[in-house]
């Protein structure tokens, strides 16, 4: 796992015919994606970005050339954009970047039974979830909430999970409004 780069955005669908693309920024303020310096993708290509509207951007390659048109923009869909970890502030105590969780062992709270390793951190807009699995462990996806993960200590390399009997989602999922995920019960 490359811990020297932090995923900060993903290229979405083309916008128009002139090479503009939608960019989904993971920065707290989406426009701040341009403040962290050069962006690199999963292929090691270097990109710069200029915002042209709400979520719409012009991508330029390392030579400063913009995408040539809609076909070039279409080829960039789902391209992940990373920044150097050194460009970002160090997380405060009890804070971390999601990439720090990848590969960490997860144990059941109370029994210390291994549940697997964090394979993927999913964020589809309705809340973050962790996918656990690995050698000898069935895949398991849990909402990344304090109810399911009461202990996350990156410095100590420790994650403890409470397996819920039931997961309840409250709120309206249709308009990206506030959604609350709660876990009830739990294996102990």
Swiss-Prot record:
Signal peptide coordinates: none
Domain PRC barrel: 93-175
Protein localization: Cytoplasm
GO molecular function, one term: ribosome binding
UniProtKB keywords: Chaperone, Cytoplasm, Ribosome biogenesis, rRNA processing
InterPro entries linked: PRC_barrel-like_sf (IPR011033), PRC_RimM (IPR056792), RimM (IPR011961), RimM_N (IPR002676), RimM_N_sf (IPR036976), Transl_B-barrel_sf (IPR009000)
Chief subcellular location: cytoplasm
Stored Pfam families: PRC_RimM, RimM
SUPFAM superfamilies on file: PRC-barrel domain, Translation proteins
GO cellular component terms, A-Z: cytoplasm; ribosome
Residues passing through the membrane, by range: none
Any one GO BP annotation for this protein: rRNA processing
Lineage: superkingdom: Bacteria
Domain comment (free text): The PRC barrel domain binds ribosomal protein uS19.
Its job: An accessory protein needed during the final step in the assembly of 30S ribosomal subunit, possibly for assembly of the head region. Essential for efficient processing of 16S rRNA. May be needed both before and after RbfA during the maturation of 16S rRNA. It has affinity for free ribosomal 30S subunits but not for 70S ribosomes.
Subunit details: Binds ribosomal protein uS19.
Family statement: Belongs to the RimM family.
Protein name: Ribosome maturation factor RimM
